[in-house]
Amino acid sequence: MKMIIIFFILLILNLIKSQQYGPTWDQINSRPLPGWYDDVKFGIFIHFGIYSVPAFANGGYAEWYWWTLKNPSSDGGATQRYHEKEFGANFTYQDFVSRFDCRLFDANEWASIIEKSGAKYVVLTSKHHEGYTLWNSEQSWNWNSVETGPGIDIVGELTKSVKNMGLHMGLYHSLFEWFNPLYLADAETGKNPTTQVYVDEILMKQLKDIVTTYEPELIWADGDWMQLSNYWKSTEFLSWLYTNSSVKDTVIVNDRWGSECRDKNGGFYTGADHFNPYKLQSHKWENCATIGYSYGYDEYEQATDYQNATELIIDLVTTVACGGNFLLDVGPDAQGTIPNNMVDRLLEIGNWLSINSESIYGSSPWRVQNMTFNIWYTTNTTNGNVYAFVFELPDDGVLILSDPIGNNKTEATLLGLKGEKGVEVSLPIESTKPGITLNIPMVAPQDYPPYVYVFRLTDVE
């Protein structure tokens, strides 16, 4: 009997490992999302490329420099005027590559900063819409970071450093390239091209190359709006990724695989940039956000253009409370350094997460997402605790939480508030109708934990 049970267990495991996902959206969408992604909650997005050299935008999106330069009407001619003034009318976008030297790039330093931020996964632009790749792509001959510019396999070096830190590595990849002649030739007929030369000769080969070479656990597609998914051959690639690739059991993807796909097909949903619905979603989703106005580095952004740590943590909290992941972007400069103002924000978030990690990592949405905009909840299914995130404490120290139902075993703790000998302080608590009332000790402002207050509630319903 024991041998029969073992046989069936092995059979089931083999069937799971050999799961086949055909090239249809029904098949692709039936694949469960690997659990690691929902557990980690917080990641860092990195936009890095030739656009990091001019580092200019008129109102955001500095990574679109080449497009706005070639299409002056898109930003009122601001980029063109800036370009001609700073570099001259005859200076081409390709000329910037010699200034993309990355001479201060240190993959270990980037990974260390990210680890200290509390982020658990990383998404690096392997190729943005400009077509320049951060690895030695055969399809981007003389337009990649190994053969031109810094002479560095940036994808390879950062992948190694990130994985050595115990973090999950992901790669962003643009499906299309603004000015690639093969794509432009395909696209001449509009939304239903009759040829797919660009897809066959460039896109599919590059996607499979980064998967087989670097084994990322996340593929973040973009440029989806330009064509339907059948042009991009998205289901064919995802069928291979989920069935035959070396990362088939752990990899996760987003939903930007065709103009009809967003919030419908693929893995987690992304919506628009900075998507935060402030309500529970039925499907796993991600909020990709910026600290300032650009994803790529913009040297003209001021300190006042950056969100402060409290604002970013509030975005993280409200995202996680509604079942999402928070992907926060940084844009390194052309020398390969992450700007100090961005590093400061990341370290501040990391400080907060070091105190309140149990309320974020591995958490789930509670039965109520928020009481008001200033009070939000998560729960940890492992320990059964509920966590109340409070953005502003009441002046009188009396905090009324109308949603949790307490009993004589209920306890409340303000995470990070220490009493004598550094021991956590249990707060006086009263069961009220509705909810519970907490009496918060009045201490010096510097003795309260920073940014957003998190209350651990035990034995509540």
From Swiss-Prot:
This is Alpha-L-fucosidase. Keywords: Glycosidase, Hydrolase, Signal. One of its GO terms (cellular component) is extracellular region. The keyword Nucleotidyltransferase does not apply. Residues 1-18 form the signal peptide. The maximum expression of alpha-L-fucosidase occurs during aggregation stage of dictyostelium discoideum. It catalyses: an alpha-L-fucoside + H2O = L-fucose + an alcohol. Belongs to the glycosyl hydrolase 29 family. Alpha-L-fucosidase is responsible for hydrolyzing the alpha-1,6-linked fucose joined to the reducing-end N-acetylglucosamine of the carbohydrate moieties of glycoproteins. It comes from Dictyostelium discoideum (Social amoeba). Pfam families: Alpha_L_fucos, Fucosidase_C. Its EC number is 3.2.1.51. The keyword Repeat does not apply. InterPro entries: FUC_metazoa-typ (IPR016286), Fucosidase_C (IPR031919), Glyco_hydro_29 (IPR000933), Glyco_hydro_29_CS (IPR018526), Glyco_hydro_b (IPR013780), Glycoside_hydrolase_SF (IPR017853). The record marks 288 as: May be important for catalysis. GO terms for biological process: fucose metabolic process; glycoside catabolic process; response to cAMP. The gene is alfA.
